[in-house]
Amino acid sequence: MAIERTFSIIKPDAVAKNNIGAIYNRFETAGLKIIASKMVHLSKEQAEGFYAEHSERPFFGALVAFMTSGPIMVQTLEGENAVLAHRDILGATNPAEAAPGTIRADFAESIDENAAHGSDSVASAEREVAYFFSAEELCPRTR
C-alpha cells in the first residue's frame, strides 16, 4: 500500500462547535498522522484563491462567505492511501447521506456547512497542501 499525503480542512462550523479534538481523534484512530496543522481565518482573497475552480458555480459566493465566517483548521495528513482513507472518514458531502459514524454524519448540519473538506486526489492534495504549507512546515513522523 502506498503512503500518501492528503489535505484536510475543519470548517468554521465545526471549529465554532469545538469539534477539533474529536475530529483529530478520528484521523488518528484511522491511522492517519497529522504532519502539519494550523488555525487560520481566511481572507476573502485566500478563500477565492483556494476555491478558484468553483468560481463560475452558483454557490461560489456563499462558499467564500462561509469559509471566511470564522477560523478554520488546516492540516496535512499522512498514511496508507491517505486520500481515500480520509474521504472515507469524512463521509458523503451531504451529511444527510453520510454513513453513521463519519465526520459529516456526526458533526455537520447541512450540505453547505458540512464540517470538513478533504482532497479528492493525490494531485489535488499536493496543490492544496502547497496553498497553505511551505515544505519546511511539514513534519514527517518517524516514530
Curated annotation (Swiss-Prot):
Main location: cytoplasm
Essential cofactor(s): Mg(2+)
PROSITE patterns assigned to the protein according to its UniProt record, in alphabetical order: NDPK (PS00469), NDPK_LIKE (PS51374)
Record SUPFAM superfamilies: Nucleoside diphosphate kinase, NDK
Database matches in InterPro entries: NDK-like_dom (IPR034907), NDK-like_dom_sf (IPR036850), Nucleoside_diP_kinase (IPR001564), Nucleoside_diP_kinase_AS (IPR023005)
Annotated compartments: Cytoplasm
Protein residues bound to ATP: K11, F59, R87, T93, R104, N114
GO CC term (a single one): cytoplasm
Keyword flag Cytoplasm: yes
EC number from the UniProt entry: 2.7.4.6
Record field: catalytic activity: a 2'-deoxyribonucleoside 5'-diphosphate + ATP = a 2'-deoxyribonucleoside 5'-triphosphate + ADP; a ribonucleoside 5'-diphosphate + ATP = a ribonucleoside 5'-triphosphate + ADP
Function text: Major role in the synthesis of nucleoside triphosphates other than ATP. The ATP gamma phosphate is transferred to the NDP beta phosphate via a ping-pong mechanism, using a phosphorylated active-site intermediate.
Subunit structure: Homotetramer.
PANTHER family reported for this sequence: NUCLEOSIDE DIPHOSPHATE KINASE, NUCLEOSIDE DIPHOSPHATE KINASE DDB_G0292928-RELATED
Protein family per UniProt: Belongs to the NDK family.
Protein known as: Nucleoside diphosphate kinase
The species this protein was found in: Shewanella woodyi (strain ATCC 51908 / MS32)
Taxonomic placement: Bacteria, Pseudomonadati, Pseudomonadota, Gammaproteobacteria, Alteromonadales
